[in-house]
Curated annotation (Swiss-Prot):
Gene Ontology biological process terms, A to Z: 'de novo' IMP biosynthetic process; adenine biosynthetic process
Keywords assigned: ATP-binding, Cytoplasm, Ligase, Nucleotide-binding, Purine biosynthesis
Cellular component per GO, a single term: cytosol
Domain of life: Bacteria
Protein name (record): Phosphoribosylformylglycinamidine cyclo-ligase
Enzyme Commission code(s) on record: 6.3.3.1
Pathway this chain belongs to: Purine metabolism; IMP biosynthesis via de novo pathway; 5-amino-1-(5-phospho-D-ribosyl)imidazole from N(2)-formyl-N(1)-(5-phospho-D-ribosyl)glycinamide: step 2/2
Length: 344
C-alpha cells in the first residue's frame, strides 16, 4: 500500500496536457469542416450526414499509417508534414474507387505527450484534410507510459468517403486497347522507408547531404501527394475504367489489383525519367530493377486506365489541375503464362 496519495499524473498520464492539446487544435479542425458535419469536438462520436446530391450513396472506408517514414520524421525532428502523409495514404485509396472523402479520424499514441509536437502533427493532418475536402471530425490522442521510447509516437488514420453506386470505379470496365495515364509522385510518398533507412545506413550517407541542390532529408520527407481534387474533376468529365494507387508492392502488385483476369498492363519505361532520389537509392543500395519497381513508386503515384478517345481531354484536365501526367502504357490481352504487368 502506498503511503502517499497517487494520481493519474503520478502514473505518467497528464489529463491537463491532453486538454491543452485539444484547445490548440480547435482552429485547425474548424477549417476542415464540411456542411454535413453535425456538432463539434468533444462528443463521444462524430456525426455526419450524407451529401444530398447522391441518389444511391455507397460508403467507402479506408485505414492506413505512414510506415517507418515516421521513424525518419521523428529522428529528423520534422513533424509538420507527416500528418499530410497520413491523410494522403487514406484518401488516395478512396479516390481510386471514385469516392469523395467525407470525414477523417486520427489515432496518435505516445509515451509522454509533447503538446508542441502533437499540435504540429495534427496541423499537418488538417492540412491534408483541407487539400482533400474532407472534415477532420475527431480522433484519439493517448498517453501510454512505458509503451514508447522517449520522443516516439505512432500514427494511424481512418477515412470514410461516398460514391454514387452507378459510378463506382472497380476495374471491371478495363478493356484491351485502353490507354494508361500516369500521375507523377512527389517522391517516395509513404512506402519503402524501411529500405530507404537501410540504404542510408549501409551507404553511410548523411541526411544533410545534397542531391540536386536539396538535402536528402527533404527528398525523403517530401509529403505524399494528395490526388483527390484532380481525380474528382477527371472522373466527372471523362470515362475512367480503373485507377491504381502505387503504394506497398509498387507496380507489380498494385496495378493487377484493378485489372480483369484476361488483361495485362504494358508499361513503357522510356515514357518518363525516375526522379533523382530513386536513382540514388538504386545506386547506393545496389537494388535490382525488379526490387525498385516492387518497393517504390519510382515517380508514379497513380496509374489510370481509360479509353483511348479520352486521352487528350484527360491530359488537359490533369494539367489544368496542376498534375504532371503522361501516357505510360496500354492494356493488352493476357496470354497464357504471362505476368499482368510488363515493364518494357
Amino acid at each position: 500500500m502506498s503511503n502517499t496519495q497517487l494520481s493519474y499524473k503520478d502514473a505518467g498520464v497528464d489529463i491537463h496536457t491532453g486538454n491543452e492539446l485539444v484547445e490548440r487544435i480547435k482552429g485547425d479542425v474548424k477549417r476542415t469542416r464540411r456542411s454535413e458535419v453535425m456538432g463539434g469536438l468533444g462528443g463521444f462520436g462524430a456525426l455526419c450526414a450524407l451529401p444530398t446530391k447522391y441518389k444511391e450513396p455507397i460508403l467507402v472506408s479506408g485505414t492506413d499509417g505512414v510506415g517507418t517514414k515516421l521513424r525518419l520524421a521523428i529522428d529528423l525532428k520534422k513533424h509538420d508534414t507527416i500528418g499530410q502523409d497520413l491523410v494522403a495514404m487514406c484518401v488516395n485509396d478512396l479516390i481510386v474507387q471514385g469516392a469523395e472523402p467525407l470525414f477523417f479520424l486520427d489515432y496518435y499514441a505516445t509515451g509522454k505527450l509533447d503538446v508542441d509536437v502533437a499540435a504540429s502533427v495534427i496541423k499537418g493532418i488538417a492540412d491534408g484534410c483541407e487539400m482533400s475536402g474532407c472534415a477532420l471530425v475527431g480522433g484519439e490522442t493517448t498517453e501510454m507510459p512505458g509503451m514508447y521510447h522517449e520522443g516516439d509516437y505512432d500514427l494511424a488514420g481512418f477515412c470514410v468517403g461516398v460514391v454514387e453506386k452507378s459510378e463506382i470505379i472497380d476495374g471491371t470496365a478495363v478493356k484491351t486497347g485502353d490507354t494508361l495515364i500516369a500521375l507523377g509522385s512527389s517522391g517516395a510518398h509513404s512506402n519503402g522507408y524501411s529500405l530507404i533507412r537501410k540504404v542510408l545506413e549501409v551507404s553511410g550517407a548523411n541526411p544533410a547531404d545534397l542531391l540536386e541542390g536539396k538535402p536528402l532529408s527533404e527528398h525523403f520527407l517530401a509529403p505524399t501527394k494528395i490526388y483527390v481534387k484532380s481525380i474528382l474533376q477527371l472522373i466527372k468529365q471523362t470515362e475512367v475504367h480503373a485507377i491504381a494507387h502505387l503504394t506497398g508492392g509498387g507496380f507489380w502488385e498494385n496495378i493487377p489489383r484493378v485489372l480483369p483476369a484476361n488483361t495485362k498492363a504494358v508499361i513503357d519505361e522510356s515514357s518518363w525519367q525516375w526522379p533523382a532520389i530513386f536513382n540514388w537509392l538504386q545506386e547506393k543500395g545496389n537494388i535490382s530493377r525488379y526490387e525498385m519497381y516492387r518497393t517504390f513508386n519510382c515517380g508514379v503515384g497513380m496509374v489510370i486506365s481509360l479509353p483511348e478517345k479520352e486521352v487528350e481531354t484527360a491530359l488537359a484536365l490533369l494539367e489544368q489541375a496542376g498534375e504532371k501526367a503522361w501516357v505510360i502504357g496500354k492494356i493488352e490481352h493476357l496470354g497464357e503464362g504471362e505476368a499482368q504487368v510488363e515493364i518494357q
